[in-house]
Structure formats: structure tokens, C-alpha cells
Amino acid sequence: MNQPPPLTFNYERDTLLAQTIALCALITNHEPNVVERSKSILANVGNYPALAYLEKRFSKGSSTFLTELRIELLKELNSVEIDGKETPLTEFQYDVWRTLPSAAATAVSAPTSAGKSFIVIEYLCNRATIEKTFTSVFIAPTRALLSEVQHRIEKRLEGVADVRVSTVPAPDVQARNRQIYVLTQERLHVLLSAAKLSVDLVVVDEAQGLADGSRGMILQDCLERLRNENPKLQAILLAPGANGFIRVGEQLGMPGIVVKETELSPVLQNRVQVTVKQGIAKQFHLSLLTLTGTREIGVVTTTRGVADPSTRLAVAALELAKSGAALVYATGPADAERVSAQFVADRPIATSDSLPQISNFIKQHIHPDYGLAAMVRHGVAFHYGNMPKLLREALEDAFRRGDIRYLVCTTTLFQGVNLPAQSVFINTPTRGKGTPLEAAHLWNFAGRAGRLGQELAGNVFLVDYEDWATKPMNESSKFDIVPSFSETISDHFDAVLEAIAGKMPKRSPRTPEHARIRAAAGLLLARASTKSTSRVLNRLSTLVEFLNFRMHSLLFRHVASLSTG
């Protein structure tokens, strides 16, 4: 008689399944016994943000005394003191929190909604509070993210005297003993070139940027210079989901880097395929993407036409996100303006007090006829990187408050800006004029669906997904971090040597390859000036093997030329 296969336990898979069962039960059934059992499951898996939401929504009387006692005990075991209050953490957050004090280098890979930046910013602020002298750098990839991080740190450190928090790459004229710089890698590069800086803690947000061409090399250069200045530097690298941190640690001189990773999100995220059947007017057919395939959910009959592909994205958002905030992906600034304009005709003037103020600001300081001024009054806006800082921040704040209901955005929001929404809408896996997007970028954006502590689930609506050239949302995808410097040396070795010899690629026409070659050559020349070139190259095991191969190839060619001569 055949024995059944032994049961295997996979913590992440089984925890996700248990959490999904509990959250789905709560969404569909509010009976007291369902609420009690779901709360018990969520406590078992350490999903305390969802429990906090339930405590606001359901009275404690919906559970028995023993259940409530057990939940409180579990919360107590996972609680730490943050800003003077006992705060329960998820299992993953608690694990990271315990690891940070003793690790010289830590990499944290987790979904957008897992709360990794919360833990790291709290750790940074805790050190700034208790240490007499402390210098930290928080590296963020975009200017849009700098303001948000600066605000979070300043808010956390309210009441703590003599701590400077700055996004300006200049030394403190007051020479305070505790300083926190919040900078892009370019700004940090300027600071390191102008002043000698000994840093105790560096945090790299969106660390997958190490693979981002010449910008990745600037980031690597900054990290190496910080470590050279202070060998005891503590480094924390954050990414929304990434592989390759061990390799990154070796190449950055952090061979003992501790990697903490999870794919669990405290919020249930549904990927919903939105399809229009040919010949059937005013209907969206919805199906759920799961690990085992696609399951039909049902049909939504619309009040608007759905036949035109150019307006279908906006129509889908209007019909399927009638409550809650929605992020809508656009391929570029022009596309963002075009799509956002499609919302206005079907949206009434909003009653918010802040939106007329934003509208007037746009008219007075940008242009009286700028289309965004009229849009915001309807609770609609577009968002991209090349916008005035004050305007961009005002739009983000209005979206967080719920005054702006539909925000049409470009890839600017893919990196770090904390703008979760109840729903996310995507209708293409490309950017610009059809350039394919890396699947991990789309998953990072989709991870903004579901506001932690405000709802149990978020929805990612994939419009016309059946027609996409690729299917990147079928299964989870991570960034594969290969530092741009080592990749450029391997792929363009001869060109880098020529650049070092003085034959730099021309600045025009500008290509990504030329920029990478110039940056790699510049990094090596900078290291040569400090006699540290060998230290950098010795970390690149793949490069050493490549150089051996190149040497043997050149010898073979030399011998061959002698024999034929």
C-alpha cells in the first residue's frame, strides 16, 4: 500500500496561507466567532498591524477573554519600546530589530508594505537619541523621497535637542555632535568631495540602485569612501525584494553581511485581471491571478463605454475604485497628463478645503492655464519627477489625506515614496515609448496596494492583461542586484582600459553604455589616486577570473601571430 508523501513545512508559504484564510474570512464574514478565530490566526503569525485595524473596527467584546488574553501575551512578546511606547512588531520586523545592533552590515529585503523602513528609521533615531556623538547618512535614490524621509526623522526626533537633520550636502556650521544627512548618492558625492566625513551609520534605501548604471557606481563609490574613512561603519541596505546581497557585500568590503528577507506582506494583495470581451459593451470581466492559475470572479456592468483602449484604463479606475484612493500607472509625463484628464468629466468638484488652495498655488506660481489646476478641484492629479518640489509634496500629502482620489503617476513612484493606496491600476509592462519594464519594478509598484493599518486588503487591477506582450505579474519577481561597476568591467573591459588611457567615450551622442564606461574609468582613476585600486579589484572574484581568461586569450593570439609570421 502506497504511503502518502510526508508533510513538509515551509514557514513563508504556510504563514501566507494562514494569513490569507484569516483576512479573506474577515472581509466576507463579520460573525463574532469568525472574527475571534481570524484574530487568533493573525496573532499566531504575528500580523499585529492587521490586528490593530481589527481592534478599531470591532469591539473587544467580539472575542472571548481567553482569546484576548492570548493575543495580548503574544503582542507583549513581540513588543519593543519605540518613542517611549510599547509597540508590537511583526515577526519579521522583530527579527530585524534584534539583528541590527550587533551586525556590521545588514541587508533587508521585503515587500513595500512590510514596514522595513519604519524599523530602520526608528533604529537610526534611537542611536541619534542615546549616543553623545553620532553621524548618519540616509541615502535615497530620488529628491522626492528625501523630503519624506527628512520629515519622518524630524517628526520622530521632536523634542530631542542638538540633532541636525539636513538634505543639504554641506557640513554643519554649528558643528553639532549629532547629525543626520538625508541625501541622494549624487549629493553625498558632493559632500564627500568637499569635506572629510566620518560616518557611524549609513542606510541605503532602494539598494537595488547599485545596479543602476553610472548612478549605481556613484553609490558604490560613496559607500567605499565612507568605509575607508571609518572601518567601523555600520551599513544597512534596504530593497523591496532582491537577490544578490551576499555578492554585493563581498564587492563592497562587507563580507559578513547579514541578510534578512521575507516575501510576506501584512496586507492581502489581490491581482485582478480586467478584460473586455469583443462585442460586449459596457462590461468588465474580472478574474483573479493565483499561484495555480486564473480564477473567474465575475462581471462588472459599467455606466461608461469600455470599447476604446485609449480610455479603458481611466474607465476601469472610475468603475472599480469608487471608494478609497487609487494609483494609476502612466508610461511618462505626457501619458500621465492625458490619462488624468479623462477622469475629470466624470468627477464632481471635491468638497475638500485643501484642493482649492493647491489649485490657486498652481495658477499663481506655475501658470494660470496649467491643466492640473482644474483637475485637482475634482480630486484628480498627475505626478512625475520633473515637477516643482512644493507642488509634488502638496499632491502627495493630499493623496495621503484622501482629498485626491485618483493619482496618475510615472515610475517616479516606483522608488521609495510612501504612497500606499487601496487600489493600483496598470495597463502595460512598459515605460516611455515601449521600453520594457523590469518585472521587479512592476511588483514594487503593485506592492503599494493596501494601506497598512487602514484596510485588510488591496487590489492590483491589470487592465487588458491578456494582451500584454509579457506576463510579469503571474508570479512574484525580485531584483537581481549585480553592481554596475563589476558588470561594466566584465562587459566593456577594453573600452574601460581605453577610457583610462585617455580615450573617454564622447559625451555626444549620450548612451547608457558610454555613461557606464566613463563612470567605471573614473572610479578606477579615483582609486588609483589613493592607491586603493587593488583593494577594489580583489573583491571582484568574477573579474579576476575574467582577467585570467583575457590574459590567456591575448597570449594565444600573440603566439598564433608569431607562428603565422
Language-model segments: residues:
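N-terminal helicase ATP-binding lobe
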Residues: 1-565
